[in-house]
Amino acid sequence: MVSAKNIVMSVAAVAALAASQASFAADEFGGLDSVAIEAGGGEHVQVVRWSAQKNWNKNWFARGGYHLSGYWDANVAYWRANRWDDIADNRKNLAVIGITPVFRWEADDKRGLYGEAGIGASVFSSVYTNTHRQLSTAFEFADHIGVGYVFANKWDVGVRVQHYSNGGIKHPNGGVNLALVRVSYGF
């Protein structure tokens, strides 16, 4: 079950791992640039997601100390659905894995305020049928928009609005919307 205590413990674990393994991750895992944890939810669902990022290190459309860049985000998530098959208190746990290219408008030094958006692909451990939201396929597109702030010590705190949908591949396709808080540490 997702609780405040579990979220705090997960954030602490990611922070400890990131701080102790930063140079190892950068060298041994093909130059990963950061790790993140996200937590939040939507209508009768709570989500915790862990991810790793690889920056593109691009400077497109540079002006006024900002530019467009981005990163690859590989993630795995735990979803706790609380109204499975539209039955009150019928719970189901799901695993979700995904990959998303994310475009970020950021400062040239990669610090301070940013805005980002991404559209990726995800696979659910089973077809989502929580409340009146049915997605009909295990494959889903995952798009988001978000804002955040990167501190000088490489910690990044942000918020996102995430939408999952199969893009009309199969009906019904009710879509699932989530509000998420994200904490990341850059190596």
Task: Give the role of each language-model region.
Residues 35-41, 72-78, 117-121, 159-163:
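Transmembrane beta-barrel strands of outer-membrane/channel proteins
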Residues 1-29:
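Cleavable N-terminal export/targeting peptides
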Residues 29, 148-187:
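Predominantly the C-terminal beta-signal and adjacent terminal strand-loop region
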Residues 23-32, 57-68, 107-114, 154:
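Short loop/turn motifs that connect adjacent beta-strands in outer-membrane beta-barrel proteins
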Residues 50-58, 76, 99-105, 117-121, ...:
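Residues on the lipid-exposed face of transmembrane beta-strands in outer-membrane beta-barrel proteins
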Residues 31, 44-48, 93-99, 139-143, ...:
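Residues that define the transmembrane beta-barrel architecture of outer-membrane proteins
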